[in-house]
Amino acid sequence: MTKLSRRVFLGSAPAAAAAAGIFGTFFSTAAEAAIKWDETYNVIVIGAGGAGLSAAVSAKEAGAKKVVVLEKMMFAGGNTIRAGGGFNAAIKADYEKAGITDSPKLHAEQTLAAGDGRGDPVLVHQLTEKAPESVQWLKDHGVKFQDHIYQIYGGLYKRARNPIGPRGGAYIKALLEVCKKEDIPILYNTRVVEIIREHQLSGRVLGVKVEQKGGKTLYLRATNAVVAAAGGFAANDRLTAISDPRMGQLGTTNHPAPPATS
């Protein structure tokens, strides 16, 4: 078994962002000996968007020898490929060059204030303190950024920068190239229908059950981790209504096949 530190893997900003919630998939109970596994990996990543691809690369760099990404669509990108691409981060060299007063601490304070103080201070500070590191991580993995910062639409402060290229697609293009270089396969048209663990809602996660195009079913075992990076639920009327019933009447800019709706 590959020795992969959970702290090292999940401690990186890109990988931590990958620990998103997954909807439309349920847990099942299965004794490991009772399942005939079709393939075994060290790390299985669900979702080939920005978070999932970052998690896969991070896992490989943290020591996982065999990593796979599962994507239910026929192409990678998720919501990231539809995003404008702007990245807010208080990077000292950038704001000093622009003559702006900024810092990760100020970024956190302004973010909390913009959310009427409802955000979790610990998580917000983690976000703003790790943002410069995440930008550097992306640069180290092939993403090139424009040489200026600006106030992104919907934002209140000047601290965003855009990648050079097709907006959010620039991130995906670079990460796909790294996955190819690192021999990280992406299984397209592969939908996760069950996360298999020792007990219904407890115990170690053993792997996943997937359905591929044409109805083929596979059981994939994970010796170290299953990372759920399958997006949110902005296109799911039932779940968004929990926060605000009016949201069910709105359209969405989310990916055409988010996890909560298919």
Please place each PLM-identified region on the residue numbering.
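Glycine-rich loop(s) and the adjacent beta-strand/alpha-helix scaffold that form part
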Residues: 215, 221-262
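Beta1/beta-strand and adjacent pyrophosphate-binding region of the FAD-binding site
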Residues: 37-51
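Aromatic pocket-lining residues of Rossmann-like dinucleotide-binding sites
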Residues: 59
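Glycine-rich, N-terminal phosphate-binding loop of Rossmann-like dinucleotide-binding domains
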Residues: 13, 48, 230-231
